[in-house]
């Protein structure tokens, strides 16, 4: 697959087809090509001998997609930076990346950045004055050159720049289009901010198939009335999000086939897909295919996938995350560095062309997480799991296991069983510390329909069900009830916010 050529062919075949929609703003494939060509021509003329990455700042504006393509056509990787990212972090990204230029279709509120800023009217002037100019195709990003760099949280407190090459992205996009049976001209949900690599799962599969990206922003998500009004107008056919976001939508009774009659495919990544969430989706959208996928940012979005059917739901209480894409392989490594046999838990290691070339400007971190196995790049995920007959089962983060009163446990396992209880719509487990040790577990619960007059009676009923599924030491000591679970801008459960709320 020639990625950029595949996107550009739609400017010729379907020039007036909408490529991207955000609120009242939209761009066609013709405009996407013309403006990204103009921008690439300007970048090449301004920085003829430079290939440093370029920061692209904003939140869901159509100009961001134009800027992404303009950067790579000129031979520069882009760094997506969402408006929600704190100024201090933006500053550290600018310093770590060595970027010299920041592009934005909106006002840049961060000050004192060590980069040249081109935003709003200046960007539009470039589109206008360089219109009709085409960049030299030899300058475009290719092969093992970086296509984009996404910054993720680092254990040291400093963000890590994950370098994803052109070849990495091509491998992912080709697999996604083929394995998920994506069709020409479909409408894709774009829920994840561009600084979160889940967005790559909708951006490039949509653009290479001549589809339309329908973006919903964080303000819509915070106002359910606006969110569902937008969804009703969208005619979305391919849904890409975290499971938490879909679970939130399922709390609205009208979120069903009647709202989105042409829904064909649900693609989930970024979190564990609870069995009960998948089951509700099958009930609400009986004609749609549900795909559960797995992969870290360091392995280009996702490397495994499985079609979740009723048979799969009945067979597995904790859903598998799928079979590995054909050009990669999975190894389960034991603590002693040997490969675990089928069915035995260990650390998930991903090998193959989806694996990043490492962290930008951080050789020590790269050496710690990445290695070479049989001549191929490999990434040690820090995730626990096992493989049975080629099917991967994810068992949470190795560092998401806690020791409570001498017992080692996985919080996600408790959450899984809690969500399966009657009267529970959503739930998160928060471990509470006393000094340096964990003291007890708190369950934050979004209750479902029930007839209990007092909260303690509801808690007793839930605990009774949990006692049938979990040992006593894994039963939460305290329960707190909320109308919703807070989420990060990326659509994941905001565990830090929850912890600050319950310990305040």
From Swiss-Prot:
GO BP term (any one): lipoteichoic acid biosynthetic process
Top-rank EC class of the record's enzyme: ligase
Main location: cytoplasm
Positions of D-alanine binding: 197, 301, 492
Membrane spanning residue stretches: none
CC per GO annotation: cytoplasm
Pathway(s) annotated for this protein in UniProt: Cell wall biogenesis; lipoteichoic acid biosynthesis
UniProt superkingdom: Bacteria
Record EC number: 6.2.1.54
Keywords in alphabetical order: ATP-binding, Cytoplasm, Ligase, Nucleotide-binding
Pfam families for the chain: AMP-binding, AMP-binding_C
Reported function: Catalyzes the first step in the D-alanylation of lipoteichoic acid (LTA), the activation of D-alanine and its transfer onto the D-alanyl carrier protein (Dcp) DltC. In an ATP-dependent two-step reaction, forms a high energy D-alanyl-AMP intermediate, followed by transfer of the D-alanyl residue as a thiol ester to the phosphopantheinyl prosthetic group of the Dcp. D-alanylation of LTA plays an important role in modulating the properties of the cell wall in Gram-positive bacteria, influencing the net charge of the cell wall.
Family per similarity comment: Belongs to the ATP-dependent AMP-binding enzyme family. DltA subfamily.
Name of the protein: D-alanine--D-alanyl carrier protein ligase
